From Swiss-Prot:
One GO term (biological process): base-excision repair
GO molecular function, one term: 8-oxo-7,8-dihydroguanine DNA N-glycosylase activity
Zinc-finger ranges (FPG-type): 235-269
Complex and partners: Monomer.
UniProt-recorded name of the protein: Formamidopyrimidine-DNA glycosylase
Cofactor(s) the protein requires to work: Zn(2+)
A Pfam family assignment: Fapy_DNA_glyco
Family stated for the protein in its record: Belongs to the FPG family.
HAMAP family hit by this protein: Fapy_DNA_glycosyl
SUPFAM superfamilies the record matches: Glucocorticoid receptor-like (DNA-binding domain), N-terminal domain of MutM-like DNA repair proteins, S13-like H2TH domain
Entry function: Involved in base excision repair of DNA damaged by oxidation or by mutagenic agents. Acts as a DNA glycosylase that recognizes and removes damaged bases. Has a preference for oxidized purines, such as 7,8-dihydro-8-oxoguanine (8-oxoG). Has AP (apurinic/apyrimidinic) lyase activity and introduces nicks in the DNA strand. Cleaves the DNA backbone by beta-delta elimination to generate a single-strand break at the site of the removed base with both 3'- and 5'-phosphates.
Cofactor annotation remark: Binds 1 zinc ion per subunit.
Amino acid sequence: MPELPEVETTLRGIRPHLQGRILKSVTVREPRLRWPVSEAIYALRDCPVVALRRRAKYLLIELEHGQLLIHLGMSGTLRVVDMDLPLRKHDHVDLLLDSGKVLRFNDPRRFGSVLFQGGDQPHSLLQSLGPEPLSDSFNGQWLFARSRGRKVAVKSFIMDNATVVGVGNIYAQESLFMAGIHPSRAAGRISLARYQALAEAIKRVLAQAIEAGGTTLKDFTRADGQPGYFAQSLNVYGRAGQPCVQCDAILKADRHGQRSTAYCPQCQR
């Protein structure tokens, strides 16, 4: 599933092609995504694109009188292509620009979404979200305060969007390894000092992943069609049964929710 670095990489790839352009029209070939394509999208014509930004894992395209929200789901990608480029399988939505280019949404598994919110009010999906992990408002003090009395595993705690947005399975595992914290440790039993280390690890891991263009394991490609290269830097994710890069102990795996979690039994406590 594309996580925050992949969405941020996509944003940086498409922004130069969309910001300041005119959205001429929208073509929907398959409306049956995670949520049906918003009815209002079909009527969009000649809309100036004011800005593009990201909130959590949502790409937000700001128009003069509303906002498009795009979520990549499990397998979605966005590419900026010539309008006459032949379609590929699973090309579900096209946003035609006045430049003759098209922002094309491809999603084999159809867990993504393309939604519209009119007016100035934020979409309901954007409400009740925690801070952005790369912002100044996210720090160890925030994690420490929110975790008091919580018995949930710290990995599940930092993957909760009410705690902090965009820290998915891959980057939660990598951040906990960098901070030396066992993923199963109860969130409420971690000290302020260790949460400060974890917050810094989350920021560092996400920044490194963005710099590498995200992580391509199966479906994800950047807006230019190229893969992300952070997979070459993974220390624990997908490496259970292999030696730890720091101490050579064999990495183990636990399950949190429906996800397998790799960790080092020596380095993470």
